[in-house]
Amino acid sequence: MNQESISQSIAIVHPITLSHGRNAEVWDTDGKRYIDFVGGIGVLNLGHCNPAVVEAIQAQATRLTHYAFNAAPHGPYLALMEQLSQFVPVSYPLAGMLTNSGAEAAENALKVARGATGKRAIIAFDGGFHGRTLATLNLNGKVAPYKQRVGELPGPVYHLPYPSADTGVTCEQALKAMDRLFSVELAVEDVAAFIFEPVQGEGGFLALDPAFAQALRRFCDERGILIIIDEIQSGFGRTGQRFAFPRLGIEPDLLLLAKSIAGGMPLGAVVGRKELMAALPKGGLGGTYSGNPISCAAALASLAQMTDENLATWGERQEQAIVSRYERWKASGLSPYIGRLTGVGAMRGIEFANADGSPAPAQLAKVMEAARARGLLLMPSGKARHIIRLLAPLTIEAEVLEEGLDILEQCLAELN
């Protein structure tokens, strides 16, 4: 693979060149087939080249390929926002805007939060990931490699421990850390918003403690602080339902969307309480390419397939296959390096750990390389890159899913 014209600051996980894909399978330019457990890093919940999405893209490309919504509205943008207002399960009137990416959605949410509250400080969480733009870098709960050598970042942003059964941080410990933050470093009246993922993606598929989310919601409601929930990776069926936040027992004030919203086309959104989305002056939100007609058409075709029944069926099938395999591997002692199973629904991660519980990223790397040689693509996550995240399309055929898990099992067995 010739990379001479590619920035060497871009890290490439798999040194192959892809040619085409179908549902949960891709082929490289040499004709080698791979089962895809990466899914474009969570973008392809409905699979590669989903027929309905492709048809929608082709049809829209013959009608209108671009028009800046700020200059003149177009039908696909309007239709998609109407669909999203019905698809997002909240109790309040919802409004929003479309963006080109998840990071851009996060950036705009920060603007809205500051504009609506008149406050500046944002509180994020250890292990979180919200994008690669300058402002979203500061939200990320990890320095290397994202924040290295880029200098001062927009703020102020503060970080708290992420309470989860997967991190070992309890609700009580996180609340104590929050109390300390407000007594030592930051005046609570300066806080505009908290931002978090209900299930951390880059962090290793770690699920937030619902008790903490509910305590935080009460805390914010009493003080006029907003909650921004990032469902960029966990949304659109990944956890077996439309979004992951309902399992927390709270509603967000602002919600970030992207990845599987549009079947592989670049699109994001920030949606939330209608009064918040009107807090900035006219012209305060927008973008030349935001809500491109072709991306909107792809999103409409995607949402049409994401019925509650479909999402539950797809998610349960994949969850059962992964969990049953994992339990069998642990019970049989397949490999001493198999640690915890993280995540929710079909959003699952497998931790690699040494006997003393410390991360084992080198062993994960060996499994990824061996799996690729056998025709399975995997993706690492976690602070130490020691958790494999399983992101196969939800629409993967049962036999292809089992074939992929068979390959993973063979590679795990070789670690012995």
Curated annotation (Swiss-Prot):
Deletion consequences: Inactivation of the gene leads to a significant growth defect on D-lysine and a relatively minor growth defect on L-lysine. Deletion mutant shows an increased concentration of intracellular 2-aminoadipate.
Annotated residues for binding of pyridoxal 5'-phosphate: 102-103, 233, 288
InterPro entries on file: Aminotrans_3, Aminotrans_3_PPA_site, Class-III_PLP-dep_AT, PyrdxlP-dep_Trfase, PyrdxlP-dep_Trfase_major, PyrdxlP-dep_Trfase_small
GO molecular function, one term: transaminase activity
Function as written in the Swiss-Prot or TrEMBL entry: Catalyzes the conversion of 2-aminoadipate (2AA) to 2-oxoadipate (2OA). Is most active on L-2-aminoadipate (L-2AA) and shows only weak activity on the enantiomer, D-2-aminoadipate (D-2AA). Shows moderate activity on 5-aminovalerate (5AVA) and weak activity toward 4-aminobutyrate (GABA). Is involved in a D-lysine catabolic pathway.
Family statement drawn from the similarity comment of this UniProt entry: Belongs to the class-III pyridoxal-phosphate-dependent aminotransferase family.
The protein's name in its UniProt record: 2-aminoadipate transaminase
